[in-house]
Curated annotation (Swiss-Prot):
The gene is LINC01546. It comes from Homo sapiens. Residues 1-26 are annotated as: Disordered. Residues 17-26 have a biased composition (Basic and acidic residues). This is Putative uncharacterized protein encoded by LINC01546.
């Protein structure tokens, strides 16, 4: 089970270029936090990642 979940989550960055910042995108991230509590042991680091990706998306849009 662990292997399957890890492979399913693999290769997905917090920013989805095909759907830029959709609400479903955010709920999916919340679900991941619930499913992988061990992975999210550094909330500050993940927050920085999300912020970085948000700014990247904005630059791509412009």
């Amino acid at each position: 089970m662990g292997e399957l979940a890890a492979s399913a989550n693999h290769g997905h960055s917090p920013c989805y270029p095909e759907r830029k910042g959709t609400p479903g995108d955010l709920s999916k991230r919340k679900m991941l936090v619930h499913f992988y509590p061990r992975r999210h042991s550094h909330p500050r680091a993940t927050q920085q990642w999300i912020l970085k990706n948000k700014t990247l998306c904005r630059r791509i849009k412009e």
